[in-house]
């Protein structure tokens, strides 16, 4: 898979959230970089799985972690 060539920004709120793992923080940045004008991201867990060479289950856990912490 060709790696994307765009910037991802992680807000201070997310960067310093002690409840989030570093992987979840990185995924948050990736998701926000892919948001459209309506604040929607249509990338699938499989997309992120391929991008980071992690299982879909792992990606789902990271997303659940973000969701459980209000992101």
Predicted regions, residues:
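Short recognition helix of helix-turn-helix/winged-helix DNA-binding domains
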Residues: 1-71
